[in-house]
UniProtKB/Swiss-Prot annotation:
Tissues of expression: Expressed in shoots, roots and floral tissues, but not in stems or leaves.
Coiled coil start-end: none
PANTHER family documented for this protein: LOB DOMAIN CONTAINING PROTEIN, LOB DOMAIN-CONTAINING PROTEIN 19
Name of the protein this chain belongs to: LOB domain-containing protein 19
Domain of life: Eukaryota
UniProt cross-references to InterPro entries, sorted A to Z: LOB (IPR004883)
Similarity section: Belongs to the LOB domain-containing protein family.
Domain LOB stretches: 15-117
One Pfam entry name: LOB
Amino acid sequence: MMTGNLNGGGRGGEGPCGACKFLRRKCVKGCVFAPYFDAEQGTARFAAVHKVFGASNASKMLLRLPLHKRLDAVVTLCYEAMARIRDPVYGSVGHLFSLQHQVMNLQAELAHVQARLSTIQRFPLQSPQQMQPPSFDPAHNNEYAMEPSNLDSVWGEEHLLQDGTGDGDFQELASQFVSRYLPAVKLPACT
């Protein structure tokens, strides 16, 4: 954790800051790194900053900034350095592209869900109690349409009921309807 020890002096009895510890030098009063790189975790963070930017360049950048902006600059330097070490080619830009891609995917998914929701709101599904059983007049019964072999070709394809969109209620309703009114038809089990 980066501390905001803004008294800016040497570390007194605490020992050197993480940056001076890494550089193996004495931490003097007024050390620019002391408020931001503590002795415990600051050494590893400063090692990354030193590897990517160099201690001298990091020091110059911090000294040019007003005190109230230095903490943000150190956080940014550490993030950029760690990202550059993880991905030497793209650095933090690779992470930004990944996040932008994730945002675009989530926006597309949201639009899809909103479209499905508006469709469902316009055409609400009826519950099994509200459904009227079809009237089957034996005089007009089409034997060809009701033969199990013909219905199996219509209902036998699993993707008709399971399109992967999460319509579990609709699939259950369809299964109940088929089992009640078309007992000869065997539907694939819902997963």
